[in-house]
């Protein structure tokens, strides 16, 4: 899915091609400057040819998305250069919350590109301080197993139970996504920050359901129990996780089934 992986399925409508004047910086040249984080060159280009700011590529990305999507690795110099370049683009009029493409209510914002592709926390923090919405990005942070990114996003107000994908066929919270990818360190961090351990997707599936289905190692189940996971929540087939665990030959699973909670719970998203 695009919200976690680099490639997107759905693209937003894109503006038509812009037309540069003679002798002005071309779009290929502008692209090279953006990707190399040449903030001074970018500043000159948009000053000489403001029409460049209207450009969006075939995937809906503008220059800010492209800047944020450059993977800087551990190069702190590139992080500083990326912030300066992003600042030029934002100050020149590019919206800090403009999406490149969408999936339902979910949006691929510049911040999402910084988290998902650039893995650029200094730039992400800059965008947040400039007013970027912190939502839509926790799936990417969890997919990347990026604990500092998860903490940064939630610390700036991201909804740890982000519901922006509830209208999609494959609806899942960031926590449930982490469980399905077997990225348990990310799942645990989300739980510590308040994620709903008993989230049910449209199929009624919970974290224990998916872990049992995938054959996840039993050592990860106590994490769910410690955060109040229930075992009596039934999926769309009427099967609850505790029932499946009681049928296991492994006595540890049967013991953990008895430790799962049974308190009242909301209905799955429809």
Protein language model annotation of sequence segments:
Residues 2-8, 14-16, 21-29, 156, ...:
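Ankyrin-repeat-protein effector appendages
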Residues 23-30, 56-73, 99-113, 133-140, ...:
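Ankyrin-repeat boundary/"N-cap" motif
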Residues 32-37, 66-82, 113-120, 140-146, ...:
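Ankyrin repeat A-helix N-terminal signature
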Residues 16-66:
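N-terminal segments that cap or nucleate solenoid repeat domains
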Residues 184-185, 192-239:
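Ankyrin-repeat and related helical/solenoid repeat scaffolds used for protein-protein interactions
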Residues 140-145, 155-192, 196-202:
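Eukaryotic tandem repeat interaction scaffolds
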Residues 39-46, 75-91, 118-128, 146-155, ...:
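Ankyrin repeat structural motif
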Residues 52-53, 96, 134, 160, ...:
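Ankyrin-repeat inter-repeat connecting loop/turn
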């Amino acid at each position: 899915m695009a919200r976690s992986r680099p490639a997107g399925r759905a693209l937003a409508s894109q503006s038509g091609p812009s037309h540069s004047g003679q002798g002005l910086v071309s779009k290929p040249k502008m692209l090279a400057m953006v990707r190399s984080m040449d903030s001074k060159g970018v500043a000159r280009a948009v000053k000489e040819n403001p029409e460049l700011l209207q450009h969006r590529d075939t995937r809906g990305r503008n220059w800010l998305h492209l800047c944020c999507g450059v993977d800087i690795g551990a190069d702190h110099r590139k992080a500083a250069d990326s912030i300066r370049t992003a600042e030029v683009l934002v100050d020149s009029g590019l919206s800090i919350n403009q999406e490149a493409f969408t999936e339902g209510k979910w949006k691929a914002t510049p911040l999402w590109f910084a988290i998902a592709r650039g893995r650029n926390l200094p730039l992400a923090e800059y965008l947040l301080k400039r007013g970027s919405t912190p939502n839509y990005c926790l799936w990417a942070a969890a997919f990347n197993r990026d604990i500092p990114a998860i903490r940064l996003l939630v610390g700036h107000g991201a909804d740890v139970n982000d519901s922006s994908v509830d209208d999609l066929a494959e609806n899942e919270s960031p926590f449930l996504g982490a469980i399905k990818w077997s990225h348990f360190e990310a799942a645990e961090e989300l739980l510590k920050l308040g994620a709903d351990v008993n989230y049910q997707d449209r199929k009624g599936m919970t974290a224990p359901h998916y872990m049992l289905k995938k054959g996840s190692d039993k050592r990860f189940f106590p994490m769910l129990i410690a955060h109040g996971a229930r075992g009596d929540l039934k999926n769309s087939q009427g099967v609850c996780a505790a029932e499946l665990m009681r049928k296991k030959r492994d006595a540890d699973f049967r013991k953990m089934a008895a430790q799962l909670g049974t308190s009242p719970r909301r209905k799955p998203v429809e």
